[in-house]
């Protein structure tokens, strides 16, 4: 009989697989994980408290730095909350630009996840392909707003800049190219026996457990729960587009992988439709006072980000700054199930499970 001894092992706070400052204290017995304790807060910047002393427009750049892989959806959620409280009607052209920006951002975010997750478990080539395509998306967004990562593009009432000449055509050309690349991704990885063995049956949880942990996004849909805010509680102009909500079956790492890959395809459908229906003329900004004062009251809105359900709560006293601002950050909630998933697993599966949850530490810590 082999004698083993329990020992504590620190993963992070600076470890390549965490893609940020995140510490995981694991208790192992041989190669089996007995207990896992996440330690967060290394990237906490007090965004919500800072916002209490900022005007509403000044808050937008701070949202870029929460989920910095999906800054457009973060920009939108704060604008959407303020617009809801003010009862603003957004110009149609602005709404189309918002949707195009958010869905391009969703594609770019999932490409980063695909490439880095596979790199973490030993596949180098997909990382290079993913960042090749992501660079094309980032260049499109750069042309639109002059930034590559932290965009600060959306405004209360619309967007800062109209699309430059020829931009919509470039978006149209990108869609068929990306669809073709996705087929190559599946040929390279999804049908690879080694990869399938690394993810099938790993990190399983049920739909009931997902709901009890308040999971959202692909982490919820992988269990078979068909819930997407864009479809079930449409905001902006999402009700004008035809797209599906991909779901999994058993809630393992394979289902999470396939859900996100399918989500890229659905985002491309939305982008294609939005580019075809894009209004030929019109304003990109509603008439909004330079100094925004939100009526007294409170509101909560939620939208679908690449990581899941991001929400924004605002309490206003009728001033130019919020009395209280609170974000529901999906990565923070999705992370909570990690200790349960890791308990009893082989240590070799740790990186696979962590990568499948797809957290962004700027969003976890806030």
Curated annotation (Swiss-Prot):
It is an enzyme of class 7 (translocase). It catalyses: a quinone + NADH + 5 H(+)(in) = a quinol + NAD(+) + 4 H(+)(out). It is a peripheral membrane protein. It holds the Pfam family Complex1_49kDa. GO terms for cellular component: plasma membrane. InterPro entries: NADH_Q_OxRdtase_suD, NDH1_su_D/H, NiFe-Hase_large. Keywords: Cell membrane, Membrane, NAD, Quinone, Translocase, Transport. The keyword Transport applies. Disulfide bonds: none annotated. Its EC number is 7.1.1.-. GO terms for molecular function: NAD binding; NADH:ubiquinone reductase (non-electrogenic) activity; quinone binding. Coiled coil: none annotated. It is found in: Cell membrane. Gene3D superfamilies: Cytochrome-c3 Hydrogenase, chain B (1.10.645.10). NDH-1 shuttles electrons from NADH, via FMN and iron-sulfur (Fe-S) centers, to quinones in the respiratory chain. The immediate electron acceptor for the enzyme in this species is believed to be a menaquinone. Couples the redox reaction to proton translocation (for every two electrons transferred, four hydrogen ions are translocated across the cytoplasmic membrane), and thus conserves the redox energy in a proton gradient. Belongs to the complex I 49 kDa subunit family. NDH-1 is composed of 14 different subunits. Subunits NuoB, C, D, E, F, and G constitute the peripheral sector of the complex. This is NADH-quinone oxidoreductase subunit D. It comes from Bacillus cytotoxicus (strain DSM 22905 / CIP 110041 / 391-98 / NVH 391-98). The gene is nuoD.
